[in-house]
A protein has these predicted regions:
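Short loop/turn motifs at secondary-structure junctions and domain boundaries
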Residues: 64-69
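Acyl-donor (CoA/ACP) binding surface of acyl/acetyltransferases
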Residues: 1-38, 58, 75-187
């Protein structure tokens, strides 16, 4: 993995992917997945309208210059084409030693291993660059694909919280159960 850090942006690459800072031109590409009901069915947000996506991108631009920075949410792009296919975030906790991993991939690219590849890179980034002791992740209990990603990453299953999140699913809200995973830097 190649980590490249400059004053303007943070980038790291995996074998097939480039993770970069979001920019103002990313609204349409983000809307392609964030505005899709199937793509966001297991998320605790969405589907988002265009204004919500614009606000999301603007918030990510603002976070790029915050000090100290606690949110590292990157655009996941196919290295060969530059096409933005999702997002991968590392959200640092207040203690500076623990973080949460989160991700979304455009459904047109599901089943190709991109989420696992980007998440593996983000875990390394969190442990190596930010010296995190523990990185956790969670997913809707019905999201078997995300569950498999966390298992492939070697994350340890820590339990399932029953009816723990009240989320918007399609046009209505409902209680959903959540699976929790974590990985220690020493693992």
């Amino acid at each position: 993995m190649n980590f490249e850090i400059s004053f303007d942006f943070i980038i790291f690459e995996t074998e097939r992917l480039l993770l970069r800072e979001f920019n103002a031109d990313d609204v349409d590409a983000v809307y392609a997945y964030a505005g899709d009901a199937e793509n966001t069915i297991y998320m605790d947000w969405g589907p988002a309208n265009r204004e919500e996506v614009r606000n999301f991108v603007q918030s990510r631009l603002a976070q790029q210059i915050m000090e100290p920075r606690r949110i590292f949410d990157f655009a996941v792009c196919i290295k060969a084409t530059g096409r933005l296919i999702g997002s991968m975030g590392l959200f640092l906790g207040d203690d500076g030693q623990q973080a949460e991993l989160g991700y979304t991939i455009n459904k047109a690219f599901w089943g190709k291993g991109y989420a696992s590849e980007a998440a593996k890179g983000m875990l390394q980034y969190g442990f190596m660059t930010h010296n995190q002791h523990r990185i956790s992740a969670r997913c809707d209990s019905m999201n078997t694909a995300s569950d498999r990603v966390m298992q492939r990453l070697g994350m340890r299953f820590e339990g399932e919280a029953k009816s723990a999140e009240y989320v918007r699913v399609r046009a209505r809200r409902q209680w959903r159960s959540v699976k929790h995973y974590a990985l220690l830097q020493l693992d």
